[in-house]
Amino acid sequence: MATVVVNPPSSLQWSGNITDIIFFGVTDHINLRIDVDDVAVEQLLLYAYNGTAKLEELSDLVEQYMLDNSKYFSNVKIYEFADEDPSSTTLLCQFNVLFCSLTVATTPAAFSQDNFLSTAHVKQFHPGMREKLYFYDPDAGTQNYVAPTLRLQVGYMDGNTMRVATVDDASSLINDCIVFSLSDIMTLASVDNVVTITLTLGARQMLYYVSDFKADSVFMFRNAFNVEENLPLNCTTSVKQVGERTVAQIKRHTVLASVEHETDYEVETAPLSPDQVLLVEQLCESLETYIWFSVFKPITISSRTCEFSDERAKEVTAKFTWRYLDGRRAYKFEALPDDEIFTEEYDPNYD
């Protein structure tokens, strides 16, 4: 009797919600091979009970592969192979997986049709950087599929008047994901003094506020959907240094044996919006985090103290501590502004 999958997974699953798979028609045992994106990640043998065998904890295996390979979307195939010939396989089932480390009260298809791969709908835009905005289209590849057009709406200041410019087709910004800088937006919309940017792709929409001031710190991390996301924060950063020198006594001389030092950066944010609260949570839990310092430098967040409240009237802030992964402090050697440079001719005569 051929092996039958009793409860085949739906075509698109959240990575953390892959159901246990039951196989029927198993005489004694079944040999399985699990492929993710056509890469064999596991081979296992399951013994049968009353003709059935159960494959459990598949979510952990798939999520670990996606994390290790920076994937937000993967295809999973489960094969059966014979004892005497492992190369002879039979495909039992296959399905697609969308990564999400959160529990979402909707299907991945419904969510991805209405949302970008971010928990935020309103964000602060950092003018000095390129923004990446990821999306997944569950209908892509289906028959008669028509890709939605990216629409751009820009709010800008014309003197003291707020005006709006619209670009009906901004698809030039799409390259696997939506990538843009402030100069790209100004060129497309043919405007200056941009204060808001609204991107619409089908039912998905993201609003950016462009501030005149630079954010105190800009972080990048892999968010709940395992894609890169920028997070500019207005915050106060305190530097804490701990150093220890070890000395050794050689005959009558004391010599320096080793020098150890640690530098931690304690961050206290300004009041956060509800969208920023969710992003800070993901930043502190992310396995891959960076801070902007001319380039993105890898860091690790060693501790955090965050008290979040559902009460909107209460200001919500967060505190966390990070350090550079390579242990090297970063410095900026910037030129002084013109009004701070001493330009008077030197007079050697002392009055």
What are these regions (language model features)?
Residues M1-A215:
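Preference for solvent-exposed, low-hydrophobicity sequence contexts
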Residues A2-N7, S11-D20, Y134, P138-D139, ...:
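Extracellular/virion structural assembly segments
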